[in-house]
Amino acid sequence: MAMWRPSDNKVYLPPTPVSKVVATDTYVKRTSIFYHAGSSRLLAVGHPYYSVSKSGTKTNIPKVSAYQYRVFRVRLPDPNKFGLPDPSFYNPDQERLVWACVGLEVGRGQPLGAGLSGHPLFNRLDDTEVSNLAGNNVIEDSRDNISVDCKQTQLCIVGCAPALGEHWTKGAVCKSTPGNTGDCPPLALVNTPIEDGDMVDTGFGAMDFKLLQESKAEVPLDIVQSTCKYPDYLKMSADAYGDSMWFYLRREQLFARHYFNRAGNVGEAIPTDLYWKGGNGRDPPPSSVYVATPSGSMITSEAQLFNKPYWLQRAQGHNNGICWGNQVFVTVVDTTRSTNMTINAAKSTLTKYDAREINQYLRHVEEYELQFVFQLCKITLTAEVMAYLHNMNNTLLDDWNIGLSPPVATSLEDKYRYIKSTAITCQREQPPAEKQDPLAKYKFWEVNLQDSFSADLDQFPLGRKFLMQLGPRPPRPKASVSASKRRAAPTSSSSSPAKRKKR
């Protein structure tokens, strides 16, 4: 007899619904008011490989390299406290104003050039490209003076939050599997904000060289005790709000120039089933830890990303260029202007060339200029919008002087009558805590544009380019010479347009 049985398959319940993230264009209303803001010439001078401390403790000369991130934190004025020409176009009781970035140009000075980086004691054993004999005679110290032209990178990331970087560092060892001294440490991928002065990937990997390379001889001097970070494009693109990256520009190129192997013991030996044992000094085989020195190849002005305007029509995330917190973060890398200037000074008056009497120095210079076009926008303070903004960033409503009512207390509270009496516990109210900058512990290049806004767009290069994008505009009416001078009445000899048509 046939019998019905319920299905043995598992029943999958739908996931718990989550709050939907909406684009800023759904609750931000854009106006027809635009402003231009630009920085002054931004300069940096320092040593390209390391910082120099002449007094022993204080850094006299900072490290300034073309392979460093330049992270500009651009401060904008509060539009709700801004002197507007016509403040009647919005209601401050029901609306708030915000800035939207619609145009940007990063200007770069200085000529194109390739700067070298290297190490006078670089760990290279053999030239594995043209080696004539594979030997295993490893001496105590085979380091050599090697210089390279590193990977070529042009990068620009724009957002209202710091860009996020990723790198590999030493991970934690499980207690159940303790390691021995000299074992390869476990690796862990970590995310940290990209700060001004952090090193970019130069072709040797995004990793913490200070923790993962104890020999101090595997990479050039400028990164041997540093951490090279690479922008985490995947995580920033997947960000729910898209504040850290509205858009980005990227161009990278390199090729392998020289091929070496490393001196030292091979910690993980080659399995014996991968080769036949040989003689004449080939057993055991030489080091199989290979490394290639990178080269950024040719630098040309035809492949430049800077010194040209970019217009933001649609961001890659939900934040379409709205400057929350009245700030913009611009993360820049440009290694096409990496020339290191050689400067020398004689220790005494020279009568002939003597290298022993000449001190040699290295300096690298950076030159930037930032220009923006901002659009004034309005947000209507409805209950739904305020609740959404509070969940997104709870400091926004505080900055707008909008407070949330605390819940009504359901328990019985104590209230003393004589609050100044010394017979009871101190009833003095604690002063409100000062507002702390959540990004104060990070290093950025501060650029203050609070006094640099101008509505006369045609007076600035980027403003004129922006007006050209809008199309031709009607000419301004000419001012009359005299207010009392009236237009002359038509004479009998002059014919009206209607009469001309009849003729």
Swiss-Prot record:
It is found in: Virion; Host nucleus. Its main location: virion. Residues 478-497 have a biased composition (Low complexity). GO terms for molecular function: structural molecule activity. GO terms for cellular component: host cell nucleus; T=7 icosahedral viral capsid. Keywords: Capsid protein, Disulfide bond, Host nucleus, Host-virus interaction, Late protein, T=7 icosahedral capsid protein, Viral attachment to host cell, Viral penetration into host cytoplasm, Virion, Virus endocytosis by host, Virus entry into host cell. The keyword Disulfide bond applies. Residues 468-503 are annotated as: Disordered. One of its GO terms (biological process) is endocytosis involved in viral entry into host cell. It holds the Pfam family Late_protein_L1. Forms an icosahedral capsid with a T=7 symmetry and a 50 nm diameter. The capsid is composed of 72 pentamers linked to each other by disulfide bonds and associated with L2 proteins. Binds to heparan sulfate proteoglycans on cell surface of basal layer keratinocytes to provide initial virion attachment. This binding mediates a conformational change in the virus capsid that facilitates efficient infection. The virion enters the host cell via endocytosis. During virus trafficking, L1 protein dissociates from the viral DNA and the genomic DNA is released to the host nucleus. Self-assembles into homopentamers. The capsid has an icosahedral symmetry and consists of 72 capsomers, with each capsomer being a pentamer of L1. Interacts with the minor capsid protein L2; this interaction is necessary for viral genome encapsidation. Interacts with protein E2; this interaction enhances E2-dependent replication and transcription activation. Belongs to the papillomaviridae L1 protein family. This is Major capsid protein L1.
